[in-house]
Regions:
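Membrane-proximal envelope and lipid/glycan-remodeling enzymes
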Residues: 1-307
Length: 307
């Protein structure tokens, strides 16, 4: 059920099919492999595994630099207390060759990109977005907007991820060492993404920037389903709800394709005007608003009527 929920019950499905050229499904796959090898590495550490993980981390970060946060997931895996964290740091200091190999492999992936940037611009580091004012506002994170707003809230347009988020609370009951790496990664990921000037990430179905981390979010989703299995009431209601949310996600995809969900962002009136409707109504076009990009580049977020 977890595989179905993540695979066809989220906006990952849309970006694997209708807009497969976007990088999110690729990064989802890379992070899935990275998570798998994190588990394998700590069961049986080796130079080969850490080198491959360095290559993976380099490619993941090259595709989307903010995904460097997956290294925190790797560092904190199976850490459940301050003493276990100290032990992890001490272990890596003693096994410094592992970190060195990972760092070299990480940088190797970036060398072709550095070379290309230097060739075309004369600079090793080059900002390729080319958008005036493209920056982070770390003192003005749009956490409420990015999570629960009608505009493009992650939990509004991908509600299965809200179930997964709640599932983080059940992780300590499943296994020690799961809670800290996932909670810290998710909180920092939300903070960083919500601090980007264009926190809604342009025209898209749902919050596409979160797709990359769905392999990590699958863990608490599985945990809450496992926890629910021991409860007479939740044993049936939670899986049923997830199946309904899978259907709802696919209905919303059709809404998005038919413009009943706007690609820029929505508002409360527009959302409820087309709720459970496959196509937009005449009133929908009257109440829809879009973001003011010029003001957003200054960290000011207001609606404006489309011309």
């Amino acid at each position: 059920l977890v595989l179905l929920a993540v695979g066809i019950g989220t906006n990952l499905f849309y970006y694997m099919t209708y807009e497969a050229a976007m990088p999110h499904a690729f990064n989802f796959s890379l992070i899935s492999i990275f998570v798998y090898f994190t588990l394998q590495f700590y069961q049986n550490p080796s130079y080969g595994k850490i080198g491959f993980m360095g290559l993976l981390a380099g490619l993941i970060t090259l595709i989307r630099p903010t995904n460097i946060l997956v290294l925190l997931f790797f560092l904190l895996w199976n850490v459940f207390s301050l003493s276990s964290f100290k032990s992890r740091i001490t272990w890596f200091l003693h096994q410094y060759k592992l970190i060195l190999i990972m760092a070299i492999a990480f940088i190797l992936v970036w060398i072709p990109q550095f070379s290309y940037w230097y060739w075309v611009s004369g600079e090793i580091f080059y900002f390729t977005y080319g958008e005036a004012g493209g920056k982070f506002f770390f003192l003005n994170p749009q956490i409420k907007n990015i999570l629960i707003s009608y505009k493009k809230g992650w939990f509004v347009y991908t509600p299965i991820m809200f179930v997964a988020f709640i599932g983080i609370l059940s992780l300590p009951k499943i296994k020690e060492g799961l809670f800290a790496p996932i909670l810290i990664f998710i909180i920092l990921n939300i903070y960083v993404l919500s601090s980007w000037w264009c926190w809604w990430f342009g025209g898209s179905f749902g919050l596409r920037a979160f797709i990359d981390c769905y392999a990590i979010m699958a863990i608490p989703l599985g945990a809450i389903l496992h926890f629910a299995h021991s409860n007479r009431w939740l044993k049936y209601t939670l899986p049923t709800m997830i199946i309904l949310l899978i259907g709802f996600n696919n209905f919303q995809i059709q809404q998005y394709k038919n413009s009943a969900i706007h690609y820029w962002w929505m508002n409360k009136e527009a959302y409820w005007e087309t709720f459970l409707k496959l196509r937009p109504t005449a009133r929908y076009w009257e109440v829809i608003t879009i973001p003011d990009y010029d003001k957003a580049r200054d960290g000011i977020y207001v609606d404006m009527k489309p011309e």
